[in-house]
Regions:
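Short, well-ordered beta-strand elements within core beta-sheets of diverse protein domains
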Residues: 13-21
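C-terminal structural segments of small proteins and small subunits
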Residues: 54-81
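Helix N-cap motif at beta-to-alpha junctions
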Residues: 22-23, 62
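Short amphipathic alpha-helix segments
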Residues: 25-33
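Short arginine-rich
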Residues: 9, 34-44, 82
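Amphipathic, hydrophobic secondary-structure cores in small proteins
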Residues: 27, 39-55
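Short aromatic-glycine-(Arg/Gly/Cys) micro-motifs in beta-strand/loop hairpins
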Residues: 1-13
Length: 82
């Protein structure tokens, strides 16, 4: 199974850091991820530090990364503000 572009596998999770243009843009990005996560009932770990958002996808019940996490990581990239 491949890792989506821009993501890395770390500690049984898919991880990516995003640097947004402002704090409000970072919060809007997180809101979009939250909408996606709620629609799929699969939720990432999120860390917000000013303009930087770190997203971690894993399936705790599976003990690591699943195909669902790979799909959600790829879909998260589509949430990025342009």
């Amino acid at each position: 199974m491949s890792v989506p572009e821009g993501w890395r596998e770390e500690d049984d999770a898919l991880v990516r850091e995003y640097e947004l243009e402002s704090f409000p843009a970072a919060i809007e990005f997180v809101r979009r991820i939250a909408d996606l996560a709620e629609s799929e009932n699969h939720h990432p770990d999120l860390d917000i530090r000013y303009r930087r958002v770190t997203v971690r996808w894993s399936t705790h019940s599976a003990g690591g990364v699943t195909e669902r996490d790979r799909d959600m990581a790829a879909r998260t990239s589509a949430c990025e503000l342009t």
